[in-house]
Regions:
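Short, hydrophobic/amphipathic alpha-helical patches that form generic packing surfaces
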Residues: 56-68
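Short acidic/histidine-centered micro-motifs embedded in hydrophobic/aromatic stretches
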Residues: 31-34, 61, 80
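Conserved short "hinge" loops at termini or chain/domain junctions
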Residues: 1-54, 72, 86-95
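Intrinsically disordered, low-complexity N-terminal regions enriched in serine/proline/glycine
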Residues: 21, 60-63, 76
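C-terminal structural segments of small proteins and small subunits
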Residues: 66-86
């Protein structure tokens, strides 16, 4: 994502999760990048800008991370993450 997209996502996270205004944007952006990297490891090539499901998972993941429950997110959202990983049709490798 580019900086402008991080700024938009930061504001969405502030509004959705009632993040206090005194929380620096850098803290939220650091959490976004950490969670974005982890989700990209689980499903490479994910587009968090245009895919609403991916964006929603990222925002929820950031919330869990900001309250220091990073691994708890993975446990609670495990079935959703697996469904998300399998939601994209894979091209036949034999072609």
């Amino acid at each position: 994502m580019i900086n402008e997209q991080y700024d938009i996502l930061t504001e969405e996270i502030r509004a959705d999760n009632q993040v206090p205004p005194y929380t620096p944007d850098d803290v939220i952006i650091d959490s976004i990048t950490k969670c974005e990297r982890r989700l990209n490891m689980l499903k490479p090539g994910t587009d968090f800008v245009t895919d609403p499901l991916s964006r929603g998972l990222l925002k929820d993941f950031v919330y869990y991370d900001m309250v220091h429950r990073f691994e708890e997110f993975l446990a609670n959202y495990g079935p959703d993450i697996r469904a998300w990983q399998l939601s994209e049709e894979v091209a036949d490798a034999s072609e």
